[in-house]
Regions:
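Sec-dependent signal peptide recognition
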Residues: 1-7
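C-terminal motif of bacterial Sec signal peptides marking the signal peptidase cleavage site
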Residues: 11-14
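N-proximal short alpha-helices
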Residues: 16-19, 101
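N-terminal pre-ligand scaffold of iron-sulfur
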Residues: 18-95, 108-109, 124-138
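Short cysteine/histidine-rich metal-coordination sites, predominantly Zn2+-binding motifs
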Residues: 94-104, 114-124
Length: 138
């Protein structure tokens, strides 16, 4: 028991939770659920790998959808993650990147990570569930 006690103490105090740094510019994003049917012509671009679509009615400044590989769809908040909300703090899709209108910072639609230097926060990710041609964004 004497040998087991130090091991237990090390395990208990050695385990720390992951530290998640909250983006101070985008901490109160609206919650939503939106279902789309890829059979409809409006969403046809999302049926193929590399396809993108921006839904301006969702999220804070809109939601960018990106078809990663023909089956997996990713969803990102369209707000610039390193800017206070303003008239120009929206990202615009350019291929597989999102570019901030305010400072021209570039973000990957594949990972959400910034591609520009000296940028602290990446794009905010939304959940996506796909069942056949029905896609739920939340």
């Amino acid at each position: 028991m004497k040998r087991l006690f130090p091991v237990i103490v090390c395990v208990i105090f050695g385990c720390q939770g992951d530290i998640v740094e909250q983006n101070p510019y985008l901490n109160n994003l609206p919650s939503f659920e939106f279902e789309l049917n890829l059979d409809l012509p409006l969403y046809d671009n999302l049926r193929f790998a590399g396809g993108t679509l921006t839904l301006s009615q969702l999220g804070f400044k809109g939601v960018h959808l990106y078809n990663l590989d023909g089956s997996q769809i990713l969803a990102w908040e369209a707000s610039c993650p390193n800017q206070r909300p303003s008239d120009c703090s929206k990202t615009i899709v350019n291929g597989i990147e999102a570019v901030c209108s305010c400072d021209d910072s570039i973000y990957s639609l594949v990972t959400g990570q910034p591609l520009s230097k000296d940028v602290e926060y990446g794009l905010v990710n939304y959940g996506v569930r796909r069942t056949g041609n029905l896609v739920l964004v939340y």
